[in-house]
Amino acid sequence: MLRMREIMLLLLLTAACDAPDSPPTGEQLAEAAPAPIRPSYEDVVAALASRREALATRLAKGGPQARSAVIAEAREALSRALIDGLLPHWMGTPWAMNGTTTKPGTGEIACGYFVSTILRDAGFNIHRTRFGQAAALRIQQATTPPGRKVHRFFSIEPESLAKNIAALGDGIYIIGLNVHVGFVVVRGGDVRFVHASYTDERVVVDEAFAKARAIELSQAKG
């Protein structure tokens, strides 16, 4: 009977014989790696709701200093869930003037309903239909935290507007145009426009803010 050391040695020798002539490249390893499984939209919504409840419990039990930390954590968790969790699921969903679908990838969605649906699914206590039909400024005012203001820009070129928004810092913002509304995502100075686009392919897109056709065609209101 072979001893354990001999078995290990035989295994090592066998592995050496079967080894390729050269180690795999990073590209080969990437191709061989299984694609990560993305959580479903429903799972993202449920996970965010669970996180929100846990944070609310900590907020209720904590003192002033702890409350500030929890609020900062909640803000970061919400931003991350919106940008990396909820919004990506909607990419490619068709736009329509009267689109009201509640599920990404099915039916059609109008720009206002896209914003209101995302906000509702993120945990905001809003009336989806009313917000979906409301003016962008009304949505902005209703979702702006106390002590914060709605930034307003008029007659400004897309590139300059992108720089002004980037100066506000990383995060996710709601932007209202004269005939349109959507989200602006800022990360490391990169400014993206995520919206149910009524131009070009007419689907939900994530595109460079300054180059977005909808920005070019619209006068920013806030």
Residue ranges and their predicted role:
Residues M97-T101, L168, V205-A210:
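N-terminal post-signal-peptidase region of extra-cytosolic proteins
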Residues P23-L137:
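N-terminal capping segments
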